[in-house]
């Protein structure tokens, strides 16, 4: 499996793990109760929000506007029953999509560079900040939740280093 496909697969796995309905079935095996206690502030006062707006200085509307521009630029639309556009699972799923786009254009330098610029911009402007906020704000001592957040934090930091290196090349 090529590198972009591996990266895409990791993003997909992490996106599913941060989704309430799929968290228990994934490799981290987080129960619904533990998920709510760790990540749903509407149900647990000590929970860490998985929404970017909780970890950013900008107001919600400007965050949403920029996120929707990213998604729509690549032809993606939000289903009205979907998570909010600033939810960690949605942002990870978008990076799954962007990394998946690398393979078909691997032999087209301009298109590949454009996709990699989008990855760089999205990671540095949105996903990196969100993951850092969740990592710093997690209060749960549940081992599966801790492992999920640590794994995501480490992976995103590796990805940030990769996209910065590629941007300088």
Where are these regions (language model features)?
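Surface/interface-facing alpha-helical segments and adjacent flexible terminal/loop regions used
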Residues: 1-169
């Amino acid at each position: 499996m090529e590198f972009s496909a591996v990266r895409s697969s990791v993003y997909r796995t992490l996106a599913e793990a941060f989704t309430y309905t799929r968290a228990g079935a994934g490799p981290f095996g987080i129960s619904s109760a533990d998920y709510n206690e760790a990540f749903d502030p509407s149900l647990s006062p000590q929970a860490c929000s998985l929404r970017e707006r909780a970890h950013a200085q900008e107001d919600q509307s400007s965050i949403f506007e920029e996120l929707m521009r990213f998604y729509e630029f690549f032809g993606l639309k939000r289903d009205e029953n979907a998570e909010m556009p600033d939810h960690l699972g949605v942002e990870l799923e978008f990076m799954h999509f962007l990394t998946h786009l690398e393979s078909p254009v691997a032999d087209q330098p301009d298109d590949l560079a454009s996709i990699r610029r989008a990855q760089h911009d999205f990671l540095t402007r949105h996903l990196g900040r969100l993951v850092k906020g969740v990592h710093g704000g997690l209060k749960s001592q549940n081992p599966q939740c801790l492992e999920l957040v640590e794994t995501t934090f480490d992976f995103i930091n590796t990805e940030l280093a990769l996209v910065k290196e590629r941007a300088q090349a």
